[in-house]
Amino acid sequence: MVDITAIFLAAGRGVRMGERGRMTPKGLLSIGPASFVEDAVATLRAHGLSSIRIVTGHLADHYKTLARERLPDAELRHNPDFADKGSLHSLLVGLKGEAGPCLLLESDLVFEPRAVEAVIADPARASLLVSGPTGAGDEVYVWADDRAGKACLKDMSKDAARWPTPHHGELVGLTYLTADAVTRLNTIGPGMVAQDPMSDYESGIVALAGTEPVICPKIDDLAWAEVDNETMLARAAELVYPRIAAARKTHPLMGT
């Protein structure tokens, strides 16, 4: 298996979480017995991904405690500019000096094991995971073009009417980068941040897709959720997490 480094983007301030976000980084919120990041790490390790890197910013000391007490082999990289620059800058902090392939994850996600399998299924190609409709609110829609029988990334937007053609699905928040893709992002990313310091990582992936194909595997019925506010947290706890827990129990790599 290709040695893949998992990079969590965990620097954000969690403003929309209100008081909860001011007290705790979103990646360290929990629904089940472990935090979102710890849940994700367990799933990654079950799939053979043991190299974990977390890009911190807001409430970084909480991640230092996590690494010291429960994830001692995780590498922490601090983004001191988390309040003034967007997630593309955090991604570049995570990718600095990296020569191998990486799996990029948003830290405020819960997801079932199939997500990891799908996004790293073809290690020779960069890949952005897509789901069917969730109705979760705040969706990011993905448009794709057909290239040699593969749906490949064209654009992303929260505006479902951005393109006249139907979107391919919804962004999940797991993106696999080949070694070549890492090199290209490290080349084009700094200029994008210089032009717009608040650039998000999604814009970097769209720019990457203009230089090489980024395939968009889709799982229509994937159990997953992003948690940006209290309403999304309640939805994830009531409707999504029970499906994820059930999927883990029956999964051949994670079942007990």
Pin down the residues of each PLM region.
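Conserved N-terminal catalytic core of the sugar/cofactor nucleotidyltransferase
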Residues: 1-8, 34-102, 193-195
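Short catalytic helix/loop segments, enriched in acidic residues and glycine
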Residues: 23-38
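Conserved beta-strand segments of alpha/beta enzyme cores
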Residues: 27, 73-75, 152, 213-215
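Conserved core of the sugar-phosphate nucleotidyltransferase
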Residues: 112-192
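Short beta-strand/turn micro-motifs composed of small residues
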Residues: 10, 56, 106, 130-131
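Left-handed beta-helix
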Residues: 1-2, 147-149, 180-183, 187-256
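Short beta-strand-to-loop acidic/aromatic patch adjacent to the donor-nucleotide binding site
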Residues: 100-110
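N-terminal nucleotide-binding beta1-loop-alpha1 segment
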Residues: 1-22, 251-254
